């Protein structure tokens, strides 16, 4: 009885802890989209004519899990979901996370999200396009030389009032495979931003650091004076020609770089009177050739056959060699410039656009938009999350992404091992077939050559017969071995030594040998490697 009571208490505690954790996750979760249900009504497709791509509610390949699918190649796509209320990014930690899978790979296309700021009055989700202003853009992008996980903060300059895109420097690369990957951006109150790929930190940066973002959120305190000009007498030459240097008297600037080799002699047998090319004697004028329309017909040229055996034809000329007296154009040696003042640059003045920030002046997030152009289909978005706690994002990664990724990884590993085994088998078969082709040409196997050749050809057409062919060849060898061993021990039959019979026997043997040679199959051409 007491054990039942303890067990009941344990279940109640477990249920309470689970409920508390669930409540905590719900409290810290701003938005979570699993796409378990069709997205119609929650996500609004842009009606802009540029966005012809069709979004579909589809399963991830190999899973029962649904996502938002890019279904067509070479299209622009636009879709948006509004938050129930704008999220203030200035208060505490904010985590942006989502999964994306390139089921057909990714050669050229984007798969990033735009976290839209509140739009102007009159804006509707149906009008979403590339001009719809955002606060943050985050996610993978790959095309040509571009291969990065974007993190772009669009920040309002407090001096000019203009919005400026600040790009994360040296962002992580996009994983190059067809597996599900989860991308996470964590914004901390201390201005730190961390980028995670599959839960692993790939980049840490400070939003206010000029070393981490381009351009920097906080401008430089000083700038070059735009009105400052270089003085006319400012000399930037570190070296100058020596004004006291004199050209040596024996310096010949006109001497050529190369001269004829006077020691060279014409090779013996050189055919001076033979041209290198002659008319093709076998060429004939085409029957439809019209001299008036096509011009005078001339036979095509071929290499002079007489020159093939000779060291050369035509006029012989001495080869050229480097001129030992060549020195080129003389110039004065360089010396340090006594008037050198260094490279001029304008003086620095206080930057009139300088301002200071303790924290970025984030714009609230009012909606999530996907606005991409891609050459690939099969891009699947899933489990889009906005949370206020890193642990919540980690929980979602472990429960939604990790199980799928593990299954996909195991499948990929099995496919790679199978492909490796297939390549190994092909190499093995090539070695076997090359060896069997050589075996088939052995003279003492001439009686069996046709059978061996037939077996090899069948095996080449059906590589899975390789083992069977090897067994068959072994049987042939074994049979031949037995015949040689046991057949050689039989007593020779008595033959009367009669010259006519011997001659007749010899003659018939020669004829039989000739017939056998005639009947033997033609030597098989070596197999071409595939």
From Swiss-Prot:
Ca(2+) binds at residues 34, 65, 382. Calcium-binding protein that interacts with newly synthesized monoglucosylated glycoproteins in the endoplasmic reticulum. It may act in assisting protein assembly and/or in the retention within the ER of unassembled protein subunits. It seems to play a major role in the quality control apparatus of the ER by the retention of incorrectly folded proteins. Glycans are attached at residue 464. This is Calnexin homolog 1. GO terms for cellular component: chloroplast; endoplasmic reticulum; endoplasmic reticulum membrane; mitochondrion; plant-type cell wall; plant-type vacuole; plasmodesma; vacuole. Residues 250-281 have a biased composition (Acidic residues). Keywords: Calcium, Chaperone, Disulfide bond, Endoplasmic reticulum, Glycoprotein, Lectin, Membrane, Metal-binding, Phosphoprotein, Repeat, Signal, Transmembrane, Transmembrane helix. Belongs to the calreticulin family. Disulfide bonds join 108-143, 307-313. Residues 1-20 form the signal peptide. Residues 21-466 are lumenal. One of its GO terms (molecular function) is unfolded protein binding. The gene is CNX1. Residues 223-356 are annotated as: P domain (Extended arm). Sequence repeats lie at residues 225-236, 242-253, 261-272, 280-291, 295-305, 314-324, 328-338, 342-352. InterPro entries: Calret/calnex (IPR001580), Calret/calnex_CS (IPR018124), Calreticulin/calnexin_P_dom_sf (IPR009033), ConA-like_dom_sf (IPR013320). Residues 224-240, 495-520 have a biased composition (Basic and acidic residues). The chain crosses the membrane at residues 467-487.
């Amino acid at each position: 009885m007491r054990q039942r009571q303890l067990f009941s208490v344990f279940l109640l505690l477990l249920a309470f802890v689970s409920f508390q954790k669930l409540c905590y996750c719900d409290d810290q979760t701003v938005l979570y989209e699993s796409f378990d249900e069709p997205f119609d009504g929650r996500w609004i497709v842009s009606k802009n004519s540029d966005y012809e791509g069709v979004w579909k509610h589809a399963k991830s390949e190999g899973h029962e899990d649904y996502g938002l699918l890019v279904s067509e190649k070479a299209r622009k796509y636009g879709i948006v979901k509004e938050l129930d209320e704008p999220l203030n990014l200035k208060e505490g930690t904010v985590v942006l996370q989502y999964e994306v899978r390139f089921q057909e790979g990714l050669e050229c296309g984007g798969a990033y999200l735009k976290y839209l700021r509140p739009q102007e009055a009159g804006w509707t989700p149906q009008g979403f396009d590339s001009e719809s202003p955002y606060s943050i853009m985050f996610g993978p992008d790959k095309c040509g030389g571009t291969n990065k996980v974007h993190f772009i903060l669009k920040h309002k300059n407090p001096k000019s009032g203009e919005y400026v895109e600040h790009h994360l420097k040296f962002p992580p690369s996009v994983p190059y495979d067809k597996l599900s990957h989860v991308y996470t951006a964590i914004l901390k109150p201390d201005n730190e931003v961390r980028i995670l790929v599959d839960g692993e930190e790939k980049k840490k940066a400070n939003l206010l650091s000029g070393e981490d973002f381009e351009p920097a959120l906080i401008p430089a305190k000083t700038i070059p004076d735009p009105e400052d000009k270089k003085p006319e007498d400012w000399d930037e030459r570190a070296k100058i020609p020596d004004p006291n240097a004199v050209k040596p008297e024996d310096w010949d600037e006109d001497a050529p770089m190369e001269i004829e080799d006077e020691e060279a002699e014409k090779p013996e047998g050189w055919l001076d009177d033979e041209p290198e090319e002659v008319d093709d004697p076998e060429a004939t004028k085409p029957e439809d050739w019209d001299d008036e329309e096509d011009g005078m017909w001339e036979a095509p040229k071929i290499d002079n056959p007489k020159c093939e055996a000779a060291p050369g034809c035509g006029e012989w000329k001495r080869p050229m060699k480097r001129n030992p007296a060549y020195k080129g154009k003389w110039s004065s040696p360089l010396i340090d410039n006594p008037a050198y003042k260094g490279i001029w640059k304008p003086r620095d003045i206080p930057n009139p656009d300088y301002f200071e920030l303790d924290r970025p002046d984030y714009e609230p997030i009012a909606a999530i938009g996907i606005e991409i152009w891609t050459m690939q289909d099969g891009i699947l978005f899933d489990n889009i999350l906005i949370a206020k706690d890193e642990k919540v994002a980690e929980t979602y990664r472990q429960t939604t992404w990790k199980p799928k990724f593990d299954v996909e990884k195991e499948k990929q590993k099995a496919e790679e091992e199978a492909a490796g085994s297939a390549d190994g088998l092909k190499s093995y078969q090539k070695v076997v077939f090359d060896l069997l082709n050589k075996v088939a040409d052995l003279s003492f196997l001439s009686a069996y050559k046709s059978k061996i050749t037939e077996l090899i050809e069948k095996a080449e057409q059906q590589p899975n017969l390789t083992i069977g062919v090897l067994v068959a060849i072994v049987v042939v060898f074994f049979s031949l071995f037995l015949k040689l061993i046991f057949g050689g021990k039989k007593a020779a039959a008595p033959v009367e030594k009669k010259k006519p019979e011997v001659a007749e026997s010899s003659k018939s043997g020669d004829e039989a040998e000739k017939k056998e040679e005639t009947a033997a199959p033609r030597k098989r051409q070596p197999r071409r490697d595939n």
